[in-house]
Amino acid sequence: MNRKFSLTAALALAWLTVSALPDAANAGQKGRNGLTVVELYTSQGCSSCPPADRLLGRLAKQSGILALSFHVDYWDYIGWKDPYGSPSNSRRQRDYKRTFNRFYVYTPQMVVGGMFEVTGFDAAAVLAGIKQASLAPNVPIDLSRDGAGDLRILISASPNPIRTAVWLALFDMENKTRVRRGENSGRTIVNYNVVRDFKKSAIGTAPPRR
């Protein structure tokens, strides 16, 4: 198991959260090169999910993309308890359900840049969403460590008021699981960038740079 605390995720997810908010259209620099966050909502108990898991694995290797797997727990009842499923991931997906005005949650679902949702194994739709999301405004962010080794994230002020949140992700880069029950019984499933912890970071106000 290769677990990684993603500082890159902090940058990208800060952008993600801002980009999905109403005032974001006037923020940042349009077309600025940055990361596009792709969230896969998946479950080892879902027979339709392995193709989406493999697609996310390919996306995870591409530059300019932060691909993350959020395992949900609402399929656990059909025979296999996903070891990475969590209620918090299911809640996050339900929040997206309201954002995108959907009547239900489903797997596999990919959310691209916080702006588009597509079926998780539809590679053409996912790539089209990534292309579109990469054109969205970005909020300039600087990442550094102080003398004590603490992480500092500086989000530049914008002339237009925006709401900003910074999320930090801890994820396993690759996990292999032999599924013994449920729809995927007998299969070995490989999951990539499996989110194990996902937290909102506190934001304070720093004095302006001189």
Model-derived features with residue positions:
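Positively charged n-region of N-terminal signal peptides that target proteins for export
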Residues: 1-5
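Bacterial N-terminal signal peptides
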Residues: 8-20
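Active-site-proximal cofactor/substrate-binding loop regions of enzyme domains
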Residues: 23-106
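Short, conserved sequence motifs used for protein processing/export or organelle targeting and
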Residues: 83-109, 115-210
